[in-house]
Amino acid sequence: MGKHYIPNSAHKEEMLKEIGFSSIEELFADVPEGFIREFNVPEGKSEYEVFMEMNEILSKNKTVLEMPTFLGAGTYFHYVPAHVKYLIERSEFLTSYTPYQAEISQGMLQALFEYQSLIAELVGLPVVNSSMYDWGSALGEAALMTVRLHRGKRLKFVVPKHTHPERMQVLKTYTRGANLEIVEVKWNDRGQVDLEDLKEKVNDAAGVYVEIPNFFGLLEENIQEIGEIAHEAGAYFVVGVDPTILGVVEAPGELGADIVVGEASYFGSPMNFGGPRAGIFATRNDPKFIRQMPGRIIGMTKDAEGKRAFVMTLQTREQHIRRAKATSNICSNEALVAVAAAIHIASLGPKGMQELGEVILKNTAYLKKRLSEVAEIPFDGVNFKDVLVKFEKPYQEIHEHLLQKNIHGGYYVKPHFPELGESALFAATETTRKEWIDALIDALREVL
């Protein structure tokens, strides 16, 4: 196959002449000779040859259908209806263009408006932005927002120690520059927020955070009481939620949340190595809250002819206003992921959302029951997706055995929480088959 050089020799000579050089070597004469080496790349290939080589490489991958995974801990295998992918691949949606010109972007803007409306209905708070980067970035922005709401007079944000470790890292990165102290609350003997410890640490806090479910997969039984403790201390109540549970539990807004964050990509997106994602961010319909909300909102208005129209509004981002006055330095969002989530949620409807939550609860309960036959379940309670399991043997050995059996085991927890010993989180979703769980237990019996 012949080579085609870009730019070609004539163009190269013309450019060199324009800048006063006779050769490429003269242009880069300042580069030490030791750093100049042969451009050692293989010969070019035809499209068919590239196709065959890539196909051979890709054939080494194993999907979750060929190798069932119980990994969980934030990334889950959910079924995405085929029409979701078809719709978001339309050129109106699949574009790098930001819809600044509302007059030519009504389709995208309305889709994002529908996303906001659906999330508002699910989380029980009326004001939703058009998404953040992910759950972690939404949490970081929520913490900073609580400080702004207190006009910088409170510089403490209280979180459960058992918040997802990676989400905790993002939170600390976000808040370090703002000198915001992250205070961790212990868990009790049931793996839930220790209310007495919370009461001791909540004074002078800007905000208090809790998750539904928590990192151990447990539903916190005292969400409303945690919110009351926060409000009594003058702190704002921030709730992080996995939205796939919202068809079977009360909305966080109904439980007293001032701000709700979460992960929208559980709807409409594959696991895809953990990304891209879309962070949920919702708050109360109060001018004080709305003005401090990060990101941007898609609003509905009327055009010059009195027809319904959608526009980007309240864009308090550094791209549009002075950096010192901006509520966030996020200059974009995850629009395509948010649209995919909206299509998926709308396709499910209220009944589908309820059925989704019920099936996940049922599969998680079966997984927990079977795991309890071969290992210790440290915490009692209702689990959603994740189940914490403690083993007597080193978990890495157990995991290697599972891989040999073509099963991907749980998420190793000990590096983050040494006090939990040889523990791992095993997860189930609506896609988890009974025979997968049974095969997992059989494999565990062999190694334990």
From Swiss-Prot:
Oxidoreductase as UniProt keyword: yes
Enzyme class name: oxidoreductase
Keyword tags: Oxidoreductase
EC numbers, comma separated: 1.4.4.2
InterPro entries membership: GcvPA (IPR023010), GDC-P_N (IPR049315), GDC_P (IPR020581), PyrdxlP-dep_Trfase (IPR015424), PyrdxlP-dep_Trfase_major (IPR015421), PyrdxlP-dep_Trfase_small (IPR015422)
Catalytic function, reaction form: N(6)-[(R)-lipoyl]-L-lysyl-[glycine-cleavage complex H protein] + glycine + H(+) = N(6)-[(R)-S(8)-aminomethyldihydrolipoyl]-L-lysyl-[glycine-cleavage complex H protein] + CO2
GO molecular function terms listed in the Swiss-Prot or TrEMBL record: glycine dehydrogenase (decarboxylating) activity
Any single Pfam family the record assigns to this protein: GDC-P
Biological process annotations from GO: glycine decarboxylation via glycine cleavage system; nucleoside metabolic process
Function noted in UniProt: The glycine cleavage system catalyzes the degradation of glycine. The P protein binds the alpha-amino group of glycine through its pyridoxal phosphate cofactor; CO(2) is released and the remaining methylamine moiety is then transferred to the lipoamide cofactor of the H protein.
Family per similarity comment: Belongs to the GcvP family. N-terminal subunit subfamily.
Subunit structure: The glycine cleavage system is composed of four proteins: P, T, L and H. In this organism, the P 'protein' is a heterodimer of two subunits.
Protein name, UniProt field: Probable glycine dehydrogenase (decarboxylating) subunit 1
Organism name: Pyrococcus furiosus (strain ATCC 43587 / DSM 3638 / JCM 8422 / Vc1)
Gene that this polypeptide is encoded by: gcvPA
